């Protein structure tokens, strides 16, 4: 009998690691990402918990590497869960990389894992609350529809360059980030029917602010910014990575078998608090 395999991109990160620990209770884990040293550290933690795990160095922006990851995972057993958390933000890198990793990388992941996902499998792509901060324009939709075209990346790059403050690279990167995360929701929903033909599900999660090591740096280095951010969250606190692990595990379970083609906004009420007048 083949073992059950769960692939987690970005599994060495705060939320990714929590997801690995939760799903690792019933499945072997394949950690995928660019930083092999961090993945091996995460693997050591999983080993201590008795979780069977593997590491596969992968740049998700590289189609060939993602294809190799999918083939490797399939060689280990039945690929039942693919959790794609990898991504970059404006504070990490430039506009070009945001589009290449977040948008093109998601296309690569879906296209590579659709053929190997076993019957009854689930794929979850991670978007962000940032996807809800800007409306999807007709120009964005037209660019999104070109996801399979050779100039897809270039189209998104052009749209990011049309930011009002073109002199600010950070502003361009911020626009590219919101656009790339909105694309993740769009592309996830665009794949629902074909995944259903295999009796598989595909959905997305949009996290708000979670107390990951990266977010802790913001709190430590920019306390005023963090305080202002916290004031926007009706829950009055940051999310905890273990909560994301539990949510992801539920969405992968049979009990969530009718949850499909939807984005789960897990932001402590932040989006509603900002955009809907409160009582």
Regions found by a protein language model. Name each.
Residues 12-13:
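Conserved glycine-rich cofactor-binding loop
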Residues 27-41:
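Conserved glycine-rich Rossmann-like NAD(P)H-binding loop of the short-chain dehydrogenase/reductase
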Residues 46-64:
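Rossmann-fold cofactor-recognition segment
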Residues 83-90, 269:
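Conserved NAD(P)H cofactor-binding loop of Rossmann-fold oxidoreductase domains
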Residues 90-92, 122-197, 209:
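Catalytic loop of short-chain dehydrogenase/reductase
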Residues 201, 259-261:
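Short, small/polar-rich loop/turn modules that mediate ligand/substrate recognition or access, typified
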Residues 233-244:
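A conserved structural motif in NAD(P)-dependent oxidoreductases
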């Amino acid at each position: 009998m083949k073992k059950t395999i769960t692939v987690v991109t970005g599994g060495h990160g705060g939320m990714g690691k929590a997801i690995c620990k939760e799903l690792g209770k019933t499945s072997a884990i394949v950690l995928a990402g660019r930083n092999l040293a961090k993945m091996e550290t995460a693997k050591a933690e999983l080993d201590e918990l008795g979780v069977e795990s593997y590491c596969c160095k992968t740049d998700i922006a590289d189609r060939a590497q993602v294809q190799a990851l999918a083939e490797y995972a399939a060689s280990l057993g039945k690929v039942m869960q693919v959790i794609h958390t990898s991504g970059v933000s404006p504070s990490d890198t430039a506009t070009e990389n945001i589009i290449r990793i977040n948008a093109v990388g998601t296309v690569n992941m879906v296209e590579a894992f659709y053929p190997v996902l076993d019957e009854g499998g689930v794929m979850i792509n991670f978007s962000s609350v940032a996807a809800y901060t800007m409306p999807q324009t007709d120009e964005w939709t037209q660019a999104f529809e070109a996801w399979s075209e050779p100039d897809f990346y270039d189209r998104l790059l052009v749209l990011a360059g049309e930011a009002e403050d073109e002199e600010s690279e950070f502003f361009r990167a911020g626009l590219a980030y919101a656009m790339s995360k909105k694309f993740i929701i769009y592309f996830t929903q665009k794949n629902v029917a074909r995944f259903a033909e295999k009796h598989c599900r595909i959905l997305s999660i949009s996290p708000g602010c979670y107390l990951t090591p990266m977010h802790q740096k913001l709190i430590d280095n920019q306390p005023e910014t963090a305080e202002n951010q916290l004031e926007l969250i009706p829950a009055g606190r940051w999310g905890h990575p273990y909560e994301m692990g539990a949510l992801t595990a539920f969405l992968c379970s049979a009990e969530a078998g009718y949850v499909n083609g939807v984005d789960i906004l897990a932001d402590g009420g932040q989006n509603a608090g900002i955009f809907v007048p409160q009582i």
